[in-house]
């Protein structure tokens, strides 16, 4: 692990998928913390994998959409070390639904986690990293979605709209904290080979892949590389960026 990176690289929803891939990739350069809600064994397996490779990692139970739970998570992290990077990855889709069959409870859960959770985590990150709060600066990388651009009709417009909120937050917050040593960017993944997509039929997947110019699904490792680059000093002049990783779609 490189020793010149100050502070922890925190990934919310870091127990699987894109979040786990971000944690594993970041561990080459930073000590890593992951917040998880329910998947205890998966979260600790990520930690073990990092430690076996010579890195430093900690898993902390925290529900980002529950302010009290999230605050306890950040307080636990404070005892371990300072924060350098926040990756706002935790999210839910709310299930496939047209708007005319969407339940209020599904909509509320999507916005509780995807929007409120991301804002609360960003708030706590700014409080710790901002030079106005005696911090040393840092980076926030939000995991948005290509759905925010495409809208996901007949699938999950509600989820797409929540990611549209993340895009707007990324742009606004990047300007708000630019003079305080914090860069804020987002990655917008497209069709990625995750547990979510593996639940689809082969016919469904092929239909989705057929419209991707690169002709395949992306990998979680490819998304992690984009996230780590945005968080790193190599992207030191990049802020307010919405980086599309959608295979050309």
Where are these regions (language model features)?
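Conserved glycine-rich cofactor-binding loop
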Residues: 15-16
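Substrate-binding pocket helix/loop in short-chain dehydrogenase/reductase
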Residues: 97-99, 103-111, 197, 204, ...
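Catalytic Tyr-X3-Lys loop
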Residues: 100-119, 141, 166, 214
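Alpha-helical segment proximal to the catalytic Tyr-Lys
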Residues: 127, 175-176, 236
